[in-house]
Amino acid sequence: MPRQKFGEERQYFESANDTKPMNKPSPMTILCEQTPVVILAGGKGTRLMPYTTALPKPLMPVGEYPILDILLRQLSKQGFRRITLAVGHLAGLIQAYFKQGQDWGVEIEYAYETTPLGTAGPIARLPRQERALLVLNGDLLTTMDFAKIVRFHYENRAVATIGTKRRTEPVQFGVIEAGPNGQITDYKEKPNLDYLVSMGIYVFAPTVREYIPRSQKFDFPDLVQRLLANQQRVVAYESEAYWMDIGRPDDYQQANEDFPKMEGIFLKTNVESAAVGTRI
């Protein structure tokens, strides 16, 4: 069977029908092992106060586990090994809990923020990488197969790939469309609004560092706007996996209701049901 090369990645990945010798690592396993991961774990979690006054948001419990514990278990089972935790608020508690990652089968390094750098800012201060970087918010509960978004990034030769989730919400009013002269062109009674939201899951090519200022606050929306202004390829990976950001009290409560029902799924690998990609 022919092999397909994924973007600038030098590894060749076998198709699903290829056979491989016993005990030989699969191409996806190699991809995960060679992909560095950054988890953003430095936020103050102001929307979850007063709980986050004494406990950093990544240590907030979901079921029997801190949310970041669940994420590290998933990454480890999927084959990712090199993890950097970007920490700030109550960083000592996070480091005391996870240490160097040996209990999770990963190697953890810590990047410390003395002043808030936003969501994208910490990337500029990391050592230069030769491979694409998987970046995750540290407060995610999801069943995404992270290897798939990394592979999608290479297949699409992107500079930045954003994990997205489709949301549909009803508009509570009748929606009118009108031209400049007031002429009504359409009237829809309480239509559904369909849109994509960011999952807080990203893959960035090494060159993305060139677009991030050092030592100042810089968020992912700022980075995407700068990339687009410079005609860089930014793509959306649309996922059907379960996803919840626990940053709001209602969502945190929902995550704690969902986790016991799906614990076996959350702590398994290759659990994502489907995903498609869309250019943005």
Predicted segment positions?
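Aromatic (phenylalanine/tyrosine) cluster motif
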Residues: 6, 12-13
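Conserved N-terminal catalytic core of the sugar/cofactor nucleotidyltransferase
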Residues: 21-39, 61, 65-137, 143-148, ...
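A phosphate-binding catalytic loop at a beta-strand-loop-alpha-helix junction
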Residues: 34-51
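A short, conserved acidic/glycine-rich loop-to-beta-strand motif
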Residues: 156-165
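Short acidic-glycine loop/turn motifs at beta-strand connectors
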Residues: 177-183
